[in-house]
Amino acid sequence: MNPMRKNIAEMAGYVPGFQPRDEQNYTKLNTNENPYPPSPKVIEAILAEVGDNLRKYPDAASRAGCEEAGRLYGFDPDWVIMANGSDEVLNNLIRAFAGEGEEIAYVHPSYSYYSTLAEIQGAKVRTFLLDEGWALKDFPERYTGKLFFLTNPNAPLGFCYPQEFIEELAGRVDGMLVVDEAYADFAKENSLDLVRRLPNVVVTRTFSKSYSLAGMRLGLAIAHPEVIAALNKIRDHYNLDRLAQTACVAALADQEYFQQCVSKIRETRDWFSAELRVLDWDVIPSHGNFVFATPPDRNGKRVYDALFERRILVRYFSDPVLSHGLRISVGTREEMEKTLAALADIG
């Protein structure tokens, strides 16, 4: 007899982007990492924390991070929870709100990890497809499931929903509307104001993209204090180590460096998109740190393989909804020039 839970034994699990062990030998544009290093103040703060303090447990509530995020975004600290990557918050939201057999939903295509997290919990999953104008197909007047996840800006496509649409959607969701803003720092709008006004809206953020801290696993959520209190009950009690908490505070405090990096990425993204169009690629206007684009022959796999041979990594999705194109992370100007030259050669 196999004592393993049936749903765990049968699930496939999430497959992340390829991470080469010899990454220095690749142009790595497949996992939406920031091409620039963390703030020098972050490195300085981490190095200052390394030493005798590491023998002590970290602050279980990550209070300094909650306070710094609250100051930056205009919330009291009890509206904020820090996490070991925003994935931890997404996982705990499902654990807190969706029991076995209960339903969560999300837009397809978007972040498929929502489905994996629901499978672990034994929850049901429902997806809503997009029409050509990015509207949700067949969305009911009232959605009665426990959680609805909306990735905004959308990943992997990069478009952004207007806040008016998100507010209307929140009014049609009986449960919680989770706005996954992993890429919001590269966009012009966010949903933080909706959190203040609507108790069923949660915003999640990550430090992996705009703050260059993918290797530290840092994220946060902002929500009504009752929701935050529930998430605090079920998170790992020491979910952020001392170095991560130190990096979090230093990163949030150095907004000048943050804005410089974000501005450079936006500028490179828009330039790269324009250059792809010169090559007759179909490019979706992006509000993230990546571009989803389709080659003239609509054969994303062919171009992916040709780039891989040149040790340029981009993201290909075999899903029929996405297989015509590629998601290309925005790197440095030099990396994107190299990629454009390769694409012109590949044809």
Swiss-Prot record:
Pathway: Amino-acid biosynthesis; L-histidine biosynthesis; L-histidine from 5-phospho-alpha-D-ribose 1-diphosphate: step 7/9. Its EC number is 2.6.1.9. It catalyses: L-histidinol phosphate + 2-oxoglutarate = 3-(imidazol-4-yl)-2-oxopropyl phosphate + L-glutamate. InterPro entries: Aminotrans_II_pyridoxalP_BS, Aminotransferase_I/II_large, HisP_aminotrans, HistidinolP_aminotransfase, PyrdxlP-dep_Trfase, PyrdxlP-dep_Trfase_major, PyrdxlP-dep_Trfase_small. The modification N6-(pyridoxal phosphate)lysine is found at residue 209. GO terms for molecular function: histidinol-phosphate transaminase activity; pyridoxal phosphate binding. It comes from the Bacteria. Gene3D superfamilies: Aspartate Aminotransferase, domain 1 (3.90.1150.10), Type I PLP-dependent aspartate aminotransferase-like (Major domain) (3.40.640.10). The keyword Membrane does not apply. The keyword Ribosomal protein does not apply. It is an enzyme of class 2 (transferase). Keywords: Amino-acid biosynthesis, Aminotransferase, Histidine biosynthesis, Pyridoxal phosphate, Transferase. Its cofactor is pyridoxal 5'-phosphate. GO terms for biological process: L-histidine biosynthetic process. Homodimer. NCBIfam families: hisC. Belongs to the class-II pyridoxal-phosphate-dependent aminotransferase family. Histidinol-phosphate aminotransferase subfamily. This is Histidinol-phosphate aminotransferase. It comes from Syntrophotalea carbinolica (strain DSM 2380 / NBRC 103641 / GraBd1). The lineage of its organism: Bacteria, Pseudomonadati, Thermodesulfobacteriota, Desulfuromonadia, Desulfuromonadales.
